[in-house]
From Swiss-Prot:
The keyword Protein biosynthesis does not apply. GO terms for biological process: D-xylose metabolic process. The lineage of its organism: Bacteria, Pseudomonadati, Pseudomonadota, Gammaproteobacteria, Enterobacterales. The gene is xylA. InterPro entries: Xyl_isomerase-like_sf (IPR036237), Xylose_isom_bac (IPR013452), Xylose_isomerase (IPR001998). PROSITE patterns: XYLOSE_ISOMERASE. One of its GO terms (molecular function) is magnesium ion binding. Belongs to the xylose isomerase family. Its EC number is 5.3.1.5. One of its GO terms (cellular component) is cytoplasm. This is Xylose isomerase. It comes from Yersinia pestis bv. Antiqua (strain Angola).
Amino acid sequence: MQSYFNELEQVRYEGSQSTNPLAFHHYNPDEMILGKRMADHLRFAACYWHTFCWGGADMFGANAFDRPWQQPGDALALAKRKAKVAFEFFHKLNVPYYCFHDVDVSPEGASLQEYLNNFAVMTDVLAEKQAASGVKLLWGTANCFTHPRYGAGAATNPDPEVFSWAATQVFTAMNATRQLGGENYVLWGGREGYETLLNTDLRQEREQIGRFMQMVVEHKHKTGFQGTLLIEPKPQEPTKHQYDYDVATVYGFLKQFGLEKEIKVNIEANHATLAGHSFHHEIASAIALGIFGSVDANRGDPQLGWDTDQFPNSVEENTLVMFEILKAGGFTTGGLNFDAKVRRQSTDKYDLFYGHIGAMDTMALALKFAAKMIEDGQLDQIVAKRYAGWNSELGQQILQGKMSLEELSRYASQHNLNPQHQSGHQELLENKVNRYLFG
């Protein structure tokens, strides 16, 4: 059978002077950055859902793409054909990882037993494809939001039978992820939220999803899964208000149910936009709270109130993101998954490559500039100087709980404190960042 992307052998690094649109201009996998290969810093992954499952439909139009595996026919045979094309794409794009939802790779079927049988078959197919290609699984997850049964949520559903079906999907997807050597397992609460408080018991739903997550953690330890569990925050869409609104909200939830040491976050840039935050803010918040895990690299449109899932193309924005990640020691089990899709009018199959190549070059440049910022050290020095007072005897006594409010009041009076404001030098810092980026 002829390959689907028959006009391309493999995308390779050709340098910034190349005019080849099917080549990397900045992403050189073997280039050493801060003592580590660029590929090992970035840990790129392509996603199954936007790339091979979306047919181009939107709220106002039908499918626009010609994808042979999306035509009518035997569902399992078409899933196998899709897997063949997917791994051809992963290989030719030269990405080390991929990600999937259960029903991205396997037909859901007409019953729970059909779902289980189909997924078992496709897990074996994926294992064969991974072994033949060398492509690995960054993370797996379960789609507990598309089917009509999940109209009122999965773990937060008012019906415990729906909760049980969702638990079966997550149980099965976790086992498949472990079997395939997945390095993480993601939990995104697509419909874990509400449309109106008039028919919603917030306390009840919070208890339900808390218990669900506890069961996921219990299953991880029971089976010996060595990967990281990740929650992906999102404020709204498809529901009006979702319980995993942003990083800070997720952390509060994890603390309530004693899970802050068990589950980290997978941060999507577009979801940060929807929450009214910068991507930089969400990354820095997760790192500060000790729950940073992985990234869905994309971008949203700040003028639109929905998830546009465009490919990342802002080197400036992503340099600051990579700066935070590098300062924190880089990825461990996580990586940069492109949760992004081509535009509906981009109907040429090679548009899939153009989108990913541009995104990979963007993140490669961001990594290089972030490394310059790390090596130069000026930004860190300015921040350290700004907070230096907290390393003094007074600062340490406060932080270590050795002074009460009354004692601090007495100290201030006895020492006749009269502190003066010190400049934050924001403009200077912004100029420095621009010089790293533009010279």
